[in-house]
Amino acid sequence: MMATQIGFSAVNAMEAKAPLASISQESAIAIQRNKNSEISSFQAIKFSHGDVSWLDEMALSVGWPAKQIPRLKNIVLRESGGCPNRIGGSVVDSDCNIIKMATMSHTSDSGLLQINGVNYDKSRNKWALLCNEMSICSQKPLLDAETNLRAGLLIWKTSGWGPWDPCQWGPEYAHRCEKGK
């Protein structure tokens, strides 16, 4: 039996530094075949502002609990309009193309869940969860829908919905706080 070394692909891990494992060539081919079918189904998504019909399947595939999907969808719609390439302060057209910057005050907010730079940028936070746990230490990987959902899941498992709840952000955000949610 011939051994093949595989690691995470750039599509799945972006900048992650994954350890390599020795497996059989047959297993490597089967894994790649499965990855190719997953990748092609997600690459076929045409993202449109306001449309998250694709989100359930992708979120479940990366590990989100089914009972959290309705709230996740509401947060994705509020934060990015369902546009995975969106950065904080950007204005997008109906096809999720960034057409201008309305403000430059929060450009570290990234992707579907508008994950803030304190979660990935060690120059802002030496305990940056995503950098330490997933080797996501820059904004670019978070502009991929699947990666953003995986990162958001880690944040949610660590902090619950707090990072996306304006009721927990302090008095200056009280106007954005919806009681009972």
Question: What does each of the following model-derived ranges do?
Answer:
Residues N74, M101-M104, L154:
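Short basic/hydrophobic patches in alpha-helices and adjacent helix-turn junctions
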Residues M1-M2, A13-C83:
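Export/targeting segments at the very N-terminus of extracytoplasmic proteins
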Residues R71, R86-I87, S94, S108-K181:
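Catalytic and binding regions of secreted/periplasmic enzymes and modules that target cell-wall glycans
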Residues G7-S9:
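Core subunits and conserved enzymes of cellular information-processing
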Residues S40-K46, E57-V62, M101-A102, M134-A145:
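Second-shell loop/turn segments in exported
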